[in-house]
Amino acid sequence: MECPFQIQVCISDRFFAFPHNLVEPQSDVGNKLIENLIVYVPTDDDRLYIDKKQFPKFNSVLVYRHEHDVNIDSRSPKKTASATIVYWNPLVPITEIGAGETRVFSVLLTNNLFYCNTMIVHHENPKCPIEFTYPETDMQSACSALLKNRNGQSVPPPIKSNLRPIACEIPLSHFKELVESNDFLLCFNLETSTMVKILSLKRIFCIFQYRKQPARYVINLPHEEIDNLYNKLNWERTRRLMKGDVPSNCATVNRSSLKYIKQAQSLLGIPDYSQTVVDFVKMFQKIIFPYQLVPNVIIKLNNFDQMVSSAPNKAEPYKKIRLFCKNDSIAISSSGIVPINMPDFSPPNTFDYSDYANRTNINFVTQRVLTDGGFSSGITVTPVKYNYYL
């Protein structure tokens, strides 16, 4: 994907609010200042947070919701030479540019902005928020009471609830609460799109950086959807790192991974305490990386939620498991090591692995693992099925 060189992207956690002071009139090809301003915002509600009085250098200010024009290729955007154009947190491709430099201010480094001329500004040291759990019925009743108020103003939570509901689509209207209060219930409208949810969560997490104490919050969404939103935010963080940002020390809880750990505890008899994950990793660290083997127990854990048929052709457990090594370029699968982002199997008819699939070689490798690794039994070795590292 390409991006026109006239677009200048600024990424900052401070851009949950619009940076009025960073908007300047641009010059046309004749070096004349263009004093007509067009600001594109991501949602209709965001139009309320653009203060036209804070643009004294412009004769006219227009604020529009940014919508994707499918008839225009973002690689060749429409040129509006009669206006200075600014984008705030765009969620769709940019299809219009103005005179001079078109500036983009965003808290999210999206796929559409990644290939643009990008600058990461204002490295923050946030106070990491803490997510907790809460009964679903109480959350739904509190969110329903809030969302009935069309203006998004704060309403008292139910008597039995100690949560403070927040309308996530309009976080700036809750800025004082998000900074001074705590125990937040993050509510979304049913019709809110995924991209707006991602942007809303990012804005709220950015606002949490201005707190003196870590924020505590719970999200009124299905666990699968929360995991998906967190994954998208983690990918955005990766894009930032690729552009030179600093790593974040804040982490989020992935429900699927947490369920996996709980199942491992039950299967292996690991006690539930602060070092559970550490002990789980140590238990298999001496076999996974040195010998490139995937423990059978990990394969079983990944089959707990699989619908395995009793039919002979479907009774085989799901074995396409990859264990990724941190800060390394390889992954370990049930059939050997493979470069990350490469297929499990080499192209057909390019590798004859008969030398590795015979009983003699398998017994030799098994004996080496048992002897060198200090194991007494219980080791199952399968031959490699590709030749990336042979």
UniProtKB/Swiss-Prot annotation:
Keyword Endoplasmic reticulum attributed: no
A cellular component annotation (GO) from this entry: host cell
Keyword set for this entry? Host cytoplasm, Host nucleus
What biological process terms from GO does the record include?
nuclear capsid assembly; transport of viral material towards nucleus
Q: Where in the cell is it found?
A: Host cytoplasm; Host nucleus
Q: What does this protein do?
A: Plays a role in the transport of the budded virion (BV) to the host nucleus and for occlusion of viral progeny.
Name of protein: Protein AC109
Organism (species): Autographa californica nuclear polyhedrosis virus
Q: Which gene encodes it?
A: ORF109
